[in-house]
């Protein structure tokens, strides 16, 4: 019988074989960290070291959780809980809160905006859209750092928080306090409160802490370089006096420091867990040698990054650096290069333009649309949250009650035709084109399913779409991706243009210390 670890390389296998005690895996980009931790969990379960029902794997996004859960299923592992920090904490709150407080759990707000706006108005602080957004971000930073309004004031001065517009530390502190009062009055909580409340209850109610620790004995945490103080505190409380935890991450890939995340917990992991065994994954299966060489050159100046990547892809095109006179010229010439790549046979979906902030997308949207190049904005509205997609799914479900002899793909085309789909893309109009792209993507998915399973019927297709929606696996339209660097993390394309590599923009200008620049 083949060993479950035979599919791993030597570095991955060494980490996966270490199934007991604290483990820290430093995994560079494209080195197979998800593959390693899923095989480690599977190996621990198969060998009887871990009970799957007492194992909790924590990720940072619902999509990552879905991918990890799916891979464990492919390895024959079931029963392991795979959740985000927030979903794991919320599940515990829903169970324990009514027991200890004899009341319902506060309502979870999908957005802070309205409550922050109310608090800003009460404090006579500017409440325009941009100011509310900046206030909400600053309140979030304070809460993930476990700071009260008074403590925020002191900490913000200490670390020299860079505030936008007319905001001051004093104004933020006052709005923060008023915001907390509004939450309390409305019996509501935000996403940070989910973690803060779980942490507080674990600290103050031993019965809850003991029950959670009895339930979960083995922990795995992905993307540990992006853990915030409140998340690390919650993990520590889940563990108690135990240390059966495996963390994986890369200090060089910390991308959420602006919202309170810090790589210090990964870098200093051994100071918290003295028996920690360290492993490095440096074999990059994602990028060719020229790209890895440039990455290593950039990261060589970062003393916190222990991993020097080694490409397993061999040679490839060199990385090119091009200067432009202005943003308009940059967009125009990148657009021309994209046309040339498409003419050479590279599909639009295999091309991406990345930038630091979302506002940079507009000029590329205009240029590529003018050239007739289909585009897909990533990091904007989620695919399954788009109005036209929701409407399409509603009509597809309605079609489940209609019997007929047509092939599934024909039925899908007929139904989507009733909501605006046509075989040919519209000639003009960005909104019309985006709607058509969404509907045509659903048609493409139907064709893919029919090709895989000629017996597939409409109920099978609707079920597959529901599964994608649940796991946030949005389908990829055949369009050039426009995305911020943050939204692009972990994704791959054949050709990538990084726009706006200019002093003050990358890294963003409000980075003032060495840590912020890193």
Please tell me what each predicted stretch does:
Residues 79-92, 373-394:
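Conserved beta-strand -> loop -> alpha-helix junction used to position metal-binding or nucleic-acid-contacting
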Residues 2-7, 43, 229-324, 394:
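Conserved RecA-like helicase ATPase core segment
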Residues 6-17, 21-29, 36, 56-57, ...:
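Conserved helicase NTPase motor core
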Residues 25, 29-37, 41, 274-277, ...:
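Helicase P-loop NTPase motor core
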Residues 1-102, 106, 186, 210, ...:
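P-loop NTPase Walker
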Residues 18-19, 99-192, 216, 278-280, ...:
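ATP-hydrolysis module of ASCE/P-loop NTPase motor domains
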Residues 49-54, 74-80, 95-108, 118-130, ...:
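Short, polar/flexible loop-turn hinges at active-site or ligand-entry regions and domain interfaces
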